[in-house]
Structure formats: structure tokens, C-alpha cells
């Protein structure tokens, strides 16, 4: 009988406050009690999106899309990480760009995905809505800019003149676009003609930032230089719309990553910041025109007093022009490297700014601002969100006996989490933690550090009970408890294994003389010295054996009671990083930096199997309770589920974005927890769904085939390769259509071809029957032809062939429709034209879906015009002419209806205004107007 296993799926992911994408600030909602406050911040949390309340530090909501990793229908690849966020506040839309080039548009009110766009081949670097929120512009690492229509749900066109990643753009209405790239160029695009009309060298190296305020444009490069440009869109002179005005130096020598403007609505004072690729943000104030004029006048006067000529004065003023426009304001310095920033509010007394850091925190700053006081106070950090995540990598995790609490240890902090609510309930300061363990009862946690310290924490009192600073002379890499929890075993890089006992001692209460409290303390018992550094120690569940991994690539097994040597397990080529022993103490597994897992028997020390398990160092292995199945995690960012008896991989769990450092298994085996370098903590829960090994292997092979097929289509290889653009010559234009083959578009094309096969066969069968019937009616020879029986599918859905094909077309997303049509071979193009010809005879269907029919027909003809022109089939020519005539008639009728309806609406509006709108006019002005107006001529009535 085929063996089945229970499937593990991701039940939760937490611990990430802000990942690599930018942050978006939204003001406090009007539903709040006071309607004010620092508002909310939208941040990326790897593949998800978090919305935080800045004041309370609470997670308001989390936006997640798609199947959970590990699900039966989930793809065998890690989910794409969010790379850019952009919100349109008037429409409550949030556009999210991902590392695989996908763009999803969310509705912030309903927390659902409205639109999916897939046109880029690399990660999204920039997104921007237009003023109305009906168009979205995206930039990517593939050097292309795409303009998307949110109403039509399609990509309008692709601008592809840059040679490297897009780093900035600015859009004015529907006419102009300015873009910068890492190729060092700044380009001005005319969006009406889709052409680049100006190109300038922005910086000698890469250009990293762009921002525009009125006619002022600022760009940043790879060094401390910042360029100021003058923007004059109305200038018709060739190359005169964008001119360089000057250069100024910022304080930081690192590149400027982002520039953003903000204006005080009360006094029209404008500020901007430059986010540097370090721990600083520099803010600047833009001087008003009166200030600039006064400064120029004073400078000119001083230069004249020095005896300079008019030319020298003009040259000097031009060189220092940037100092007249900009005034350095304040510099914000964070403790951590800054990932992104955003202005929040500005008033006459302060500026407020929020930022996210590389250490998984959100910081909110207030910059005091006094007009009359040039020496403003330093920026103040008013809010911080850091409780729900750790600053550095989680190196060790453990689960309490009752499966309710989770301990995570990192450099500088130990956090205790509620597994059910995923909230941090305790935070302790500690050293550089390498290993931690819950004591029986779940109220005490023991922790080992890189400095050789042992620290014992009490969760109930939130205090540090005991610290042994000289527990070891080097890093404590591993610790374990005996099954009764009374003894502790620690292994260190000082080549010793130490045994500790827990004892209760009376401790003097601080501030008293004779009051004592019982406190649990650690007491050193014995020491086992070995020849090499110890990386891992593990006590068998029956307390019989102690397994120790050494730096010499071996694992030595001792009897725990007598400390006598029992077995030496050798065979790994690199040090063993993790050990675990099965529940029956009969099997031991070891994982190593050589990417292998070895399964050994503890009776004779024989190696049952050696598995090449991962693509990088395997950091941890854990048996499931009461089972020989086990989990492993690696630096290749994958968690794997194995059968230790059949030596087969049951599941590959892709979710983490980077190295997975630690694993912990619940005492009942109901869930597994993993932690990673990406700051995320993920809970993998056992489900009722069953896993069959053969099905998983087939699924993996299918995914590999699909990926290969998509790659061949994109690169132009294989029989079903991508066809060239309709322009056809192979010359790369600055603008092109938005096309990208995806698995969804391929499947949509296949569904359409199946519908065409079924529908056209039915249509041709009916046409043949009608011809035979007419011939029989004329000659009356033989028996009358039998009407063919309809297709069972059409009878079941009660539709005609053309209705069935039209329904299939309607079910394809608009953003995938053209890509689905591009998949069809030319034989199916002819069938599609036959379908259009049939629809022309069905006036009801034609007028109901005229826009869709026209769009598909025009695209098919444009895309296949060379093949169609070369056809010598007279029937095809007649068919196309017939379609042209019928379509023109239908479009003319629709145009007439539209004109009639527009005029009718205008008349209704006029009548409504006459009845409801009244204009109040001054009596004196009205009399004067009537007296000045010409008297109308009176015509007599002739009877």
C-alpha cells in the first residue's frame, strides 16, 4: 500500500516590521476619536504588506495574497518579495510591485486585490499613479517603463530607451514624463507620441534619485554631488525644456537614494530631504523668490565693490546659484542604516518624517522649525515601532512544553512570543545569543552567548535570575537538557562539555537586611574535555547517550552516566552543525556544512543513508515526536520534510527569502517553527491534507517543464516561440506593446483554442448541412440530409457555438487577452476570423460585445498581417471584406446611438438646470445691462 503523510502548510509569518521596500505614510483616519495623530504606515513584510499604527505600535492589518506556502496547489518556489509600494489617497488604492515583475493593485478599504499586471521581466523599482488614479506608471530593473490603464486593466505601452534599472521618474498629467536610470541618463518623454525628446547626462556614474517641485528638478548620483535642473515644459526650443543650473555638495559621501518634497500650505515654504545610503537623512529648505532676489542683489553689490567686471560677476553668480536656492536645514541621524523614508506632516512650527531601517524598526521624527530662529533644535525621535521584531538574525528558537510560548534569541535580545496571537509578550536584554532552551514548566529560559556566558531568565517576573560570566572560555554553541530537566549540558568552542545542576538558593531581597527569597541558580558539576571545538550537543530521550559534534567533522557518542566513549560517527567532509536523536533513541541524524544529512543507527553506529539534502550548509535538523520523520533547514532558504525510514523527501517548504538559521518542533508534532536571516518567524502547521510522494514528484516535474516552456517563449526558442512584434523588422523602438507570456496567459490561450476547435467544428457542420439541404430541396434526389446532433458540451450549457467562444473570451482577463491571442498558431487565427464572420451575422451578440470584438480583431490582424497578406485563399479575402463591411455598419450605428444619447443627456442637464439653478443678479447691474443692450426688432403678425 502506498504510504501517505500529513501535509505541513504555513499557518503564520511574523517578526518582520519592515523589509526592503519603501514605506508609504497615510494620515490618521477620520474614524478616530480626535482624527489626528501620527497616522499609519504601510510597509513591506517580505511577500506581505503590513499597515502599522505609528502611535500605538500595533499591527492594524496585514495584506496577503495567494495560497499559503506548502499548500497542495502552491508553486514550488519562494513567493516574490515586495519591492515597491505606492498609494493613491483619493481612491484608497495601493499598488505593490514584486521582485518577479508582477504588480498588484489593492483596495485598502476591502483589503482585496483588484488588479494583477505582469509585464516586467525583473523586479519593480518604482510605481506612480497619475493625478486621477486611472493610470499607473511602473519602472523596473529590466530598464523599461510601462504605462498601465487601471480602467481598461491593460498595459498601454512600454518605453524602453534606458539601458539599466529605472531609479526615478516624474509624470505631469498625460503629456510628459521625466525618468532617470542607473545608466546615468535623464530623459524627457512625450507621452502623446511615446517618444523620448530630450536626453541629458545626469551624472558621470549612476543616477539614483529624482524629484520635481514646480520648475525645480533635483537629481543625485553615486557620490556627494547633487544636481539642480530647471524645468520649462512650455519651452518649444529644441533641447530647452530641461537645463542644468548648478551643483551642490551634501554632507554624506554616500549616494543619495531618494528625494522627496513637501510644502507648508500656510506660508508656501517648501522643504525636501535626501535619503543617503547610510544612517543619515539631510533636509533642505527652498528659499522663496524674494529671498533669492535679495541674496543675489547683495552678492552682486559685494562683487562690484571688489572691482569685478559684469562677465565675472555673472559667472560667479552662476557657479554659486545653488546656494541661493537651497538652504541646508537639519540632518537626521539614526542608529541603523536607513532603508526608506517619507514625509508625514508639515506646519509652521515643525516638520515630521517617518523612516524604516535595515534593523527591522520604524522611527518617527519631529524636526522643530522656527522662521526667526535659524538655529533650530535637533530632530526628536517621538515614536518607535520595534517590539514586534528583532534587530538582528534569530540564531536560536525553542518552544515551551505546553506549545503556547516561543523563545527567539538574537544578538542583544531574547524575545518571548505568544504562538497563538503572534505577539511579543516579553523582551530581555542579553549578550550575543547562540542557543536557548525552555526549562520544564515554560517559565524559565536558559541562554548561551558568544562570550561564553550562561544567562537564566524568569518570564513571570521578567527578570534575569542568574548569570555565569565565566561558564566557558569561548562561545557556547549548543546546550541541551536531560529528560527530567534537572541537568544542563553545554558545549563550547573552548573544547569542553560542561554539566550543570539547578539548585534553589535563598537570595537577599534588595533593600532589606533579613528577607530572603528562594531563587533558582546554576551550579557547575563536571567537565568533559575533548580535542576540538564543540558545535552541538544532544542528550538522547532515554538519558542514556550524549552525542557531541566536533570541529574535526566527527560526532562522538558517550554514555551519559559514566562519560565513557561509545561510538565515533565519521564520514562528513565538513563540521557537523546539528544533531538530533529519535524518540526511541535508536536513530541519530547529523547535518553538516557539506550539504549532507546522514542517518545513523545508535546500536552499532552504522550509517543507514547519506542524503544530499540542500544546496548550502544545513543549519538544523529536528525529529518529529514519536516518529522517524524529520525536518531540516539550510542556508539555501528551504525547509524540508523527510522520511527517515524510506530516506525520501516528503515536502519542500519554500517561503523564507534568505538563510534559515533555526528550527523548533512542537512537543506534539502539530507544528514546526523556523527563523531566518530575513527576520521572519514562520509557523508550519500540520493539516488534514495528505501527501503522496509520487504526486509531489510529478508536480515538481510539471513545474520545471512549465518554467522551461515560458523561458523558451520569452527567449524565442522552441517550436512555439514568441512571434516578433507586429512592426516586424527586428529594430528596437523606443515604445512598444506590453507583452509577457505567463502560465496564466498560456492556459488562457489553450482554453480559447479548445473553444475555437469545438465551436468552429459545430459551425462548419451546420454550414455543410445547410448547403446539402438547399441542394436536396432543389433536386429532391435521395433522402433528405440529417441535421447533425449538437455537441454535448454546447447542449449542456445551452449555448450556440459563437456564444460559447464569446463566453470563453470574456472569462480571460483583459491584461492577459493579447498574450493569449499571441499563443495561437496561424491555423487558429483563421478559425478566429471564421468566428468573427459568424458573429457578424448575429446582431444581438455583435452589439452586446462590439468593443471586445473590435479590439481582438484589430490585434489579430495587426499581429498576423504578414501571414494574412501572403494568403491566396479567395474565400478568406471575401470573408475579411464581409467582416469589414459589417463591422463598419455596426460601428456607424453605435456612433449614431452614442451621439443621440450624448445630445439627450445634454438636453436633460439643460432642463434640470432651468428648474433647479437660479442666478442672483444685482438689480442696478441688470438695469444697466438691459439699457445698454440693443432693442429687438418687433415683427407684426400677418393674418
Swiss-Prot record:
This protein's UniProt keywords: Nucleus, Repeat, Ribonucleoprotein, Ribosome biogenesis, rRNA processing, WD repeat
Listed InterPro entries: G-protein_beta_WD-40_rep (IPR020472), SSU_processome_Utp12 (IPR007148), TBC1_cilium_biogenesis (IPR051570), WD40/YVTN_repeat-like_dom_sf (IPR015943), WD40_repeat_CS (IPR019775), WD40_repeat_dom_sf (IPR036322), WD40_rpt (IPR001680)
Annotated protein name in UniProt: U3 small nucleolar RNA-associated protein 12
PROSITE patterns in the cross-refs: WD_REPEATS_1 (PS00678), WD_REPEATS_2 (PS50082), WD_REPEATS_REGION (PS50294)
GO biological process: endonucleolytic cleavage in 5'-ETS of tricistronic rRNA transcript (SSU-rRNA, 5.8S rRNA, LSU-rRNA); endonucleolytic cleavage in ITS1 to separate SSU-rRNA from 5.8S rRNA and LSU-rRNA from tricistronic rRNA transcript (SSU-rRNA, 5.8S rRNA, LSU-rRNA); endonucleolytic cleavage to generate mature 5'-end of SSU-rRNA from (SSU-rRNA, 5.8S rRNA, LSU-rRNA); maturation of SSU-rRNA; maturation of SSU-rRNA from tricistronic rRNA transcript (SSU-rRNA, 5.8S rRNA, LSU-rRNA)
Organism lineage: Eukaryota, Fungi, Dikarya, Ascomycota, Saccharomycotina
Gene Ontology MF term list: snoRNA binding; U3 snoRNA binding
Function: Involved in nucleolar processing of pre-18S ribosomal RNA.
Annotated disulfide bonds: none
Region span, Disordered: 715-739
Keyword Acyltransferase: no
Family: Belongs to the WD repeat WDR3/UTP12 family.
Compartments where located: Nucleus, Nucleolus
Misc. comment: Present with 9620 molecules/cell in log phase SD medium.
Species assigned in the record: Saccharomyces cerevisiae (strain ATCC 204508 / S288c) (Baker's yeast)
